[in-house]
Amino acid sequence: MSLNRRVFTQTIAAVGVTAAAPAMAAATIEVTMKNNPKAIFVPATVNCKVGDTVTWTNPGVITHSVTCDPAQAVDKANAVLPAGVQPFDSNNMEQDATFSHTFTVKGTYKYICKMHEAMGMVGTVVVS
């Protein structure tokens, strides 16, 4: 086999292996709403990548929300999202309810529980 044909064959083989490699699967990150001794998100800050999903779960009897909307926050600094991104809101989450959001834009998202923002129930998602 000539040198040019061998290089061509090796190049095609390498491209085929690269093209066949599976894409990295999107991750799902879990956040739990806790009530004792105070209302908090656990963990309070999560890091994820574009395409990942965060799922919040309320295992307790106290109603909570996941609200990333400055218009609904008492302190606008507690609900922040990247420019051009639409706000999101779980609405009221009763016991055992879950809410999921897939992040498609890089940036820092600060969110609140509408019922407990004044008590410090705030969280952050950092998307890279």
What name fits each language-model region?
Residues 3-128:
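Extracytoplasmic copper-binding redox domains, predominantly the cupredoxin/blue-copper superfamily
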